[in-house]
């Protein structure tokens, strides 16, 4: 019996341009799927250009509200107010942006990005951060400075003031997510950061947009799994 194959919220991340040089390897397998959705708009367009139906859906972590995550957040370990720096890599722009926010708010910065040592560029790094601590660090931050998709996603989930710092080639998932949520102005270079504007983000509008996007994403899943 043929098994149903569903790809939910897959992603090309920042590698959409490289996909064309590997089509012989992955397209035959992709065509075996009954339903396909991805997280970025240019990914939707690319997959559709290959004759495969594709929809734009939310990352699965965004299908939940902050109330769903709060029970698994670790106990707060940093009692004072702080700025959080988190990214998928460490670069000068991210560090400078974090220090800029720190100076503006008069708060210390804590770092949970590589490399794994206690201090990096004068910023202390938390070495005791697993998934539950990660959620807690974002939830309790006064401001989040990130260049990571999931740093961005969870900042919107916990409705924190944040900035997603772009350096060269950005993750297209971040572009698509923030565009859908009406937060494109949070994706900037370090020289474009408007801290005062980020501090007064209207998350009520973001909640409304998320609610509609969740319905679309859940409809995709329900339709894809119908009859099983």
Model-flagged regions — what are they?
Residues 1-228:
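Active-site anion-handling motifs in enzyme catalytic cores
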């Amino acid at each position: 019996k043929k098994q149903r194959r569903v790809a939910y919220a897959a992603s090309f991340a920042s590698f959409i341009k490289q996909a064309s040089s590997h089509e012989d390897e992955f397209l035959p397998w992709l065509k075996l799927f009954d339903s396909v959705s991805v997280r970025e708009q240019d990914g939707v367009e690319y997959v559709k250009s290959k004759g495969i139906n594709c929809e734009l859906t939310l990352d699965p972590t965004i299908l939940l509200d902050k109330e769903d995550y709060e029970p698994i957040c670790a106990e707060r370990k940093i009692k004072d107010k702080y700025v959080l720096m988190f990214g998928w890599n460490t670069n000068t722009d991210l560090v400078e942006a974090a220090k800029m926010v720190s100076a503006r708010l008069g708060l210390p910065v804590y770092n949970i990005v590589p490399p794994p040592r206690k201090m990096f560029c004068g910023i202390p790094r938390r070495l005791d951060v697993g998934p539950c601590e990660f959620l807690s660090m974002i939830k309790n931050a006064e401001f989040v400075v990130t260049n990571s998709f999931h740093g961005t996603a969870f900042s919107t989930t916990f409705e924190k003031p944040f900035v997603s710092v772009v350096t060269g080639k950005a993750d297209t998932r971040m572009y698509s997510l923030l565009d859908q949520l009406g937060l494109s102005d949070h994706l900037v270079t370090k020289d474009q950061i408007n801290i005062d504007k980020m501090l007064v983000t209207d998350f009520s509008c973001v909640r409304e947009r998320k609610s509609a996007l969740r319905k679309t994403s859940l409809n995709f899943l329900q339709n894809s799994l119908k009859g099983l």
